[in-house]
Design a protein with these regions (language model features):
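Terminal C-lobe "cap" of eukaryotic-type protein kinase domains
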Residues: 212-237
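Conserved N-lobe beta3->alphaC-helix segment of eukaryotic protein kinase catalytic domains
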Residues: 1-19
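Activation segment signature within eukaryotic-like protein kinase domains
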Residues: 67-68
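Protein kinase catalytic-loop region centered on the HRD/HxD motif
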Residues: 73-83
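A short, aromatic-enriched beta-strand patch in the conserved N-lobe beta-sheet
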Residues: 29-30
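Conserved short submotifs of the Hanks-type protein kinase catalytic core
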Residues: 34-48, 52
Length: 258
């Protein structure tokens, strides 16, 4: 407790507890003791997606699609609930520990609700996943956090396949300007796949439509849900899953929980 309890912690509590979904880590309760504010969440036994991908040196296209299908369903639900996550990444995506793992999104500390919180206008998130409009935002300007979430999903898909970030380069490691170089590549959407990987034309088409600098021209989630690559081997009922999700009866409560 104290100065570390910021507006981000409050947003995390208010937004996360509304998101009850199979692909989102369940928010169970929050309580305060003498020195700490404690958030109790569902346990995900399989660790996070970053470690999972790194251990395998990247995933086969079919396995990456399995995870990406779940990611998009989770993100679509979050957006339906009026929330932009603003920090979607492998490190914030947990696994349930089953033989064919299911993903669980977590960490809503940078999230914003479109009705109850101001429009996104700050450069928050993890640099490697930032959308161009987030990088370019200036004081007094805003951007659509839901649209920038889609960019982050595209970066996640690339990392799942390759095992490294799309806008980083091996030669940057010893360069003191490596962060700035990466940011410039993001703004130019300058990425490619290693020659060792054989990426299907459908996958390349989808990524080319997600990783678009102009947010107005970026593919939408409904369009992703209809894309041929996304729909391949899609389990029955997945597209309709979010129609059956029940919104918590408590609604969005903004009482002082800190």
């Amino acid at each position: 407790r104290g100065e570390k309890i910021t507006k981000y912690v409050e947003r995390e509590i208010l937004n996360h507890r509304q998101l009850v979904h199979p692909h989102i880590v369940r928010f169970k309760e929050v309580f305060v003791c003498q020195n700490f504010l404690c958030i109790v969440m569902e346990y995900a036994a399989g660790g996070d997606m970053f470690d999972y991908v790194v251990r395998r040196g990247g995933l086969r296209e079919s396995e990456a699609r399995w995870f990406f299908q779940q990611l998009i369903i989770a993100t679509e639900f979050i957006h339906r609930m009026g929330v932009a996550n603003r920090d979607i990444k492998l490190e914030n995506t947990l696994l349930d520990g089953s033989p064919k793992p299911l993903i669980k999104l977590c960490d809503f500390g940078y999230s914003k609700h479109e009705k109850f919180q101001s429009a996104p206008g700050s450069r928050v998130g993890t640099p490697a996943y930032l959308a161009p409009e987030v990088i370019l935002t200036t004081t007094g300007n805003t951007y659509n956090g839901k649209v920038s979430d889609i960019w982050s999903c595209g970066v996640m898909l690339y990392v799942m396949l390759v095992g490294s970030y799309p806008f980083e380069r091996a030669e940057d490691k010893k360069d003191p300007q490596r962060l700035q170089r990466m940011i410039q590549r993001i703004l130019r959407v300058e990425y490619s796949f290693p020659e060792r990987l054989h990426i299907s034309a459908e996958l390349q088409d989808l990524l080319d439509k997600i990783l678009v600098a102009d947010p107005e021209k970026r593919i939408t989630i409904p369009e992703i849900l209809e894309h041929p690559w996304y729909n391949k081997d899609l389990p029955p009922g997945v597209k309709e899953m979010n129609d059956t999700m029940v919104i918590p009866s408590s609604g969005y409560q903004t009482e002082d929980c800190l």
